[in-house]
């Protein structure tokens, strides 16, 4: 089973994360940031990755450190669960609509972290969460997971719908990319023979 657990403690946050890439989309998420919890639940449900997150952070300041560090911890857990990445499909992509909003995500689990983020919001906050923090979460996740990640909002008016379609599209792309290719189950999906992160 491809599982991993991560504990991350800093002066700003204390976070425990567990993932099972071969799960069924079960989740138990508590970050202290209601909207972030909602998005992480969508990530789990639509990727079929079981996800546990218990985070305590300096929310008396703002949600920045908690959001970023949760992204790091989930990314680290996914990276660890992937191991040498042998047999994975590696690539995934998805178009996900939510009412008037449509998002496109393309993902490569290449161990070459990079984020392209083409998402704009009309509001400063969703609930208590600053909308600028969503990019911080995706950046932290991509870096820690070793993922090349392109996220593009094609159109949409409702900011809730836009960001939710971003997380759901990531979920669907991740589900596709982590799948084991039965034709290449014993091979690393790279002509270099490794996805160890070196250029």
UniProtKB/Swiss-Prot annotation:
Q: Source organism's superkingdom?
A: Bacteria
| Cytoplasm recorded as keyword | yes
Q: Name one GO cellular component term.
A: cytoplasm
Q: What is its EC number?
A: 4.2.1.19
Descriptive protein name: Imidazoleglycerol-phosphate dehydratase
Q: Where in the cell is it found?
A: Cytoplasm
**In its keyword annotation, does this UniProt entry include Cytoplasm?**
yes
One Pfam family matching this protein: IGPD
Query: What gene makes this protein?
Result: hisB
- Tell me the classification of the organism that encodes this protein: Bacteria, Pseudomonadati, Pseudomonadota, Alphaproteobacteria, Rhodospirillales
Q: Principal place where this protein is found?
A: cytoplasm
Q: Enumerate the HAMAP family for this protein.
A: HisB (MF_00076)
Recorded hits in NCBIfam families, A to Z, give: PRK00951.1-1 (NF002106), PRK00951.1-5 (NF002109), PRK00951.2-1 (NF002111), PRK00951.2-4 (NF002114)
* GO BP: L-histidine biosynthetic process
**What does the sequence similarity comment in the record state about its family?**
Belongs to the imidazoleglycerol-phosphate dehydratase family.
Query: Record's InterPro entries?
Result: IGPD_sf, ImidazoleglycerolP_deHydtase, ImidazoleglycerP_deHydtase_CS, Ribosomal_Su5_D2-typ_SF
Keywords in alphabetical order, please.
Answer: Amino-acid biosynthesis, Cytoplasm, Histidine biosynthesis, Lyase
Q: Which organism is it from?
A: Paramagnetospirillum magneticum (strain ATCC 700264 / AMB-1) (Magnetospirillum magneticum)
Annotated GO molecular function terms are: imidazoleglycerol-phosphate dehydratase activity
């Amino acid at each position: 089973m491809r599982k991993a657990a991560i504990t991350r403690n800093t002066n700003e946050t204390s976070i425990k994360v567990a993932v099972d890439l071969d799960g069924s989309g079960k989740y138990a998420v508590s970050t202290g940031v209601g909207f972030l919890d909602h998005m992480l639940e969508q990530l789990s449900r639509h990727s079929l990755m079981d996800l546990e997150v218990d985070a305590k952070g300096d929310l008396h300041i703002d949600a920045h450190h908690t959001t970023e560090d949760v992204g790091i911890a989930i990314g680290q857990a996914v990276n660890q669960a992937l191991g040498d990445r042998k047999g994975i499909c590696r690539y995934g992509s998805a178009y996900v609509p939510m009412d008037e909003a449509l998002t496109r995500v393309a993902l490569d689990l290449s161990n070459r972290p990079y984020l392209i983020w083409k998402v704009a919001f009309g509001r400063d906050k969703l609930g208590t969460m600053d909308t600028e923090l969503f990019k911080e979460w995706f950046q932290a996740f991509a870096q820690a997971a070793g993922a090349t990640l392109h996220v593009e909002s094609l159109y949409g008016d409702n900011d809730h719908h836009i960001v939710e379609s971003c997380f759901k599209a990531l979920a669907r792309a991740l589900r596709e990319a982590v799948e084991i290719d039965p034709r290449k189950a014993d091979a690393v999906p790279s002509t270099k023979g490794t996805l160890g992160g070196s250029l």
